[in-house]
Structures are given as structure tokens and as C-alpha cells.
């Protein structure tokens, strides 16, 4: 798992970061893990739309309730309407599975 985090930390372009974030999402533990959360959450706030979009997908693999604030921000104010829609769908999914912030 350390390799996945190192890949995110070492990414030098938005494309390489997006790929690393997706892999980190795939490899994230099902139980909340601060190290994975911090990196994916940062990607949800990235200036590049491609990174944010990939981070939204990464969240689907380990839907920690702690992602709700970032997803809500994307849903309410992201410049990309498609990304706003994806965040809305994911938040609805969180509601269905009972993933609420503690």
C-alpha cells in the first residue's frame, strides 16, 4: 500500500496524478484510512478537472463518509456540470448505503 501512496506523492503531472489517485482508490482499505483519505481528498480539490474527476471515481472504491464535504462542494460549485452530476450520484449512493460522517 505504501507504493500506491508514494505514486500519488511523486506524480509530476495532472495525468500521472489522476492515474495514481485512481490506483490509490482501488487499493484503499475498506475501513477509513487517513493516509489514503488525505491524498484522494486533496485530489478532489485539485485545480485540474481531470484529477477531480478521477478522484470522484476513486472514492467509489472506498466510500469513506469523510469525503462528503468535498463531494458536496463539487456538486454545488464545480465548473464542470458532468462532474457536478457525478458527485450528486455518489452522494445519493452514500445516502443509500448509510455512509454518513461521524
Q: In which residue ranges do the predicted regions lie?
A:
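Short inter-helical turns and helix N-cap capping residues of alpha-solenoid HEAT/ARM repeat scaffolds
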Residues: 12-13, 47-48, 79-84
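Short, charged/polar micro-motifs that form catalytic or ligand-binding hotspots
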Residues: 10, 45, 57, 61
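Amphipathic alpha-helical scaffolding segments comprising HEAT/armadillo-like alpha-solenoid repeats
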Residues: 1-8, 30-45, 65-76, 99-102
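Surface-exposed beta-loop interaction hotspot
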Residues: 2-17, 21
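Structural detector for internal amphipathic alpha-helices that build alpha-solenoid repeat scaffolds
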Residues: 15-31, 52-64, 85-99
Amino acid at each position: 500500500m505504501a507504493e500506491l501512496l508514494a505514486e500519488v506523492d511523486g506524480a509530476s503531472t495532472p495525468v500521472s496524478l489522476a492515474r495514481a489517485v485512481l490506483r490509490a482508490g482501488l487499493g484503499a482499505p475498506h475501513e477509513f484510512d487517513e493516509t489514503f483519505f488525505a491524498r484522494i481528498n486533496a485530489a478532489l480539490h485539485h485545480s485540474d478537472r481531470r484529477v477531480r474527476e478521477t478522484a470522484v471515481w476513486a472514492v467509489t472504491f472506498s466510500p469513506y463518509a469523510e469525503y462528503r464535504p468535498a463531494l458536496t462542494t463539487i456538486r454545488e460549485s464545480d465548473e464542470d456540470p458532468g462532474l457536478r452530476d457525478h458527485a450528486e450520484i455518489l452522494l445519493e449512493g452514500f445516502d443509500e448505503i448509510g455512509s454518513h460522517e461521524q
